[in-house]
Amino acid sequence: MARDVLTDLTKVRNIGIMAHIDAGKTTTTERILYYTGITYKIGEVHDGAATMDWMEEEQKRGITITSAATTTFWGDNQINIIDTPGHVDFTVEVERSLRVLDGAVAVFDGKEGVEPQSEQVWRQADKYEVPRICFVNKMDKLGADFYYTVRTIEERLAAKPLVLQLPIGSESDFQGVVDLVRMKALTWRGEVKKGEDYAVEDIPAELADEAAKYREQLVEAVAETDEALMEAYFGGEELTEEQIKNGIRKLTINREAFPVLCGTAFKNKGVQPMLDAVVDYLPSPLDVPPVQGLLPDGETAAERKPSTQEPFAALVSKISVHPFFGKLTYVRVYSGKVSSGTQVINSTKERKERIGKMFQMHSNKENPVDEIQAGHIYAVIGLKDTTTGDTLCDPQNPIVLESMTFPAPVIEVAIEPKTKADQEKLSTAIQKLAEEDPTFQVKLDDETGQTIIKGMGELHLEVLVNRMKSDFKVEANIGKPQVAYRETIRKTVEKYEYTHKKQTGGSGQFARVIISLEPIEQSADSATYEFENKVTGGRVPREYIPSVDQGAQDAMQYGVLAGYPLVGIKVTLLDGQYHEVDSSEMAFKIAGSIAMKEAAAKASPALLEPIMAVEVTTPEDYMGDVIGDLNSRRGHIQAMEERSGVRVVKAQVPLSEMFGYVGDLRSKTQGRANYSMVFDSYAEVPANVAKEIIAKATGE
């Protein structure tokens, strides 16, 4: 039976489960749902039966693709959980879930320690200042090493681990944990009723010294949070359990340290103490600073406190298509409350919206609620023009909350429907999937008439194409993956003048613009473009300025070298001229567009390609072959290190050189090496390679 949403926000936790692919996130979430009483049968990822992996694609692959949201209770506390994907191609899901969370559980593989994707997700959580606790999972795995994993958290993430538990036994002999706060042993003997019952015992004699050492470090870290505690500690007083817990909570919420616990979710050991830690140490909506935003003027800062007494404000974190309700919009409510049927304003797009039915979600099942209120995550239906990152708020007290930034797609494929009937279904499928996923983009190739879909990697596009088949019944042919190149400029062009004039009977067209172009720094997660207006004395009327901006942006879509989108450019409108009768928005848009294109051709244009951060794990014997192969792919070796008896090579390699790498690596190392790859940045293509790419793109 669904319980009501808690209004006492001190007892609410909005958390995410984040990790590298295969570290055991979904299994951990499943166990949480089981122990908190929502699922009555434990779902296993291996069987394709996990509750949170509700899309057919996820169940088939055993990985999480979209961040399912679920609400559950632990004791008298409410935990809203988002299970995020760990595969690099689905960064957008991680990004948008972290934006609306207050805290997270970072799950690590007890044998592998910090892996490349865990590092990337950790950095994303740093960006949104999310407090975390760490759960070292898979302690029953052959080669699991708790202390090694703690070391990698410190070294690779430059984070301060705060060890709260030590493992009792390891690998197949892993029996439980030493709780350093209570100084007791918690043991799970055998497979007792799915691990629900655990014994609280004295610490085994052989672990007493180790436990005392780590307890000392813990108490010292806690004492440093408060002068009174520091005096008591150095005065030889024992700190109480409550004082220690309060100190850990303070360190965690301030992100000065990250509590580390351990267990094995698959074998049902260590999950309940981890849930206790979520409640004890992660922040409630009241512990995080008020959410920041801007008033509609776009300049005045404003904030909303997490209270139902404040005006309503919510951020849209995700859109998904539901088989019965159609468009489901997930929102994190930061302040105020609204009931069904209320009119709100989408302040990002300045559109009115009416909220229809509202639900508290459990994976893909829904519990209807009468009102949505501050501090919680819900799904609502009935919103027409709202997309991910938009703000919904009280029409009388508008605010625009900080949105999310999503990386530009790096790979594209052509897609062709097999029949005329598929053509219509394909358009619907593409529109719905693009609504759900901001990193999935579509364009029509003007020359070939083909539909091109773009995404974050081969797996990302493969999953989307398979969803078109399963969810929308579209049959389509898919082309070979292509790299999403970009173009940029290398030098500044001052005062470039263009006049657009047309006289064909009746009123003509007239617009003169003088612009400058300059290269600007590009960030990994946005295709940068800036526009500045420096026109004085009304030489270009104010109502035409946005048209020049729009024209320049239109021209950015097709670069001058090979027709790839332009990035990293600042356009400044310096001066211009207009005609009382013949000038129009359209005339200035055309002038802005052509001026931009012609000026870019004079600004030393260059071709850019996506560079991937590649990490290869290989036995020592194949090290030479692996490095030689990466060098032959125009790779730059960044670092080499030893990790758990194998060698790790880190390199930066152009994406265009990485197609088919998985097969080549397998054959070179007899299948003993593996690799991971994440998008790093865009970089200039060497001249000899660029020449070939441009010739191919322009058909020369």
Curated annotation (Swiss-Prot):
Pfam families: EFG_C (PF00679), EFG_III (PF14492), EFG_IV (PF03764), GTP_EFTU (PF00009), GTP_EFTU_D2 (PF03144). GO terms for biological process: ribosome disassembly. It is found in: Cytoplasm. Residues 10-286 form the tr-type G domain. CDD domains: EF-G, EFG_III, EFG_mtEFG1_IV, EFG_mtEFG_C, EFG_mtEFG_II. One of its GO terms (molecular function) is GTPase activity. InterPro entries: EFG_II, EFG_III, EFG_III/V, EFG_IV, EFG_V, EFG_V-like, EFTu-like_2, G_TR_CS. GTP binds at residues 19-26, 83-87, 137-140. Keywords: Cytoplasm, Elongation factor, GTP-binding, Nucleotide-binding, Protein biosynthesis. It comes from the Bacteria. Disulfide bonds: none annotated. The keyword Transcription regulation does not apply. GO terms for cellular component: cytoplasm. Catalyzes the GTP-dependent ribosomal translocation step during translation elongation. During this step, the ribosome changes from the pre-translocational (PRE) to the post-translocational (POST) state as the newly formed A-site-bound peptidyl-tRNA and P-site-bound deacylated tRNA move to the P and E sites, respectively. Catalyzes the coordinated movement of the two tRNA molecules, the mRNA and conformational changes in the ribosome. PANTHER family: RIBOSOME-RELEASING FACTOR 2, MITOCHONDRIAL (PTHR43261:SF1), TRANSLATION ELONGATION FACTOR G-RELATED (PTHR43261). Belongs to the TRAFAC class translation factor GTPase superfamily. Classic translation factor GTPase family. EF-G/EF-2 subfamily. This is Elongation factor G. It comes from Saccharopolyspora erythraea (strain ATCC 11635 / DSM 40517 / JCM 4748 / NBRC 13426 / NCIMB 8594 / NRRL 2338). The gene is fusA.
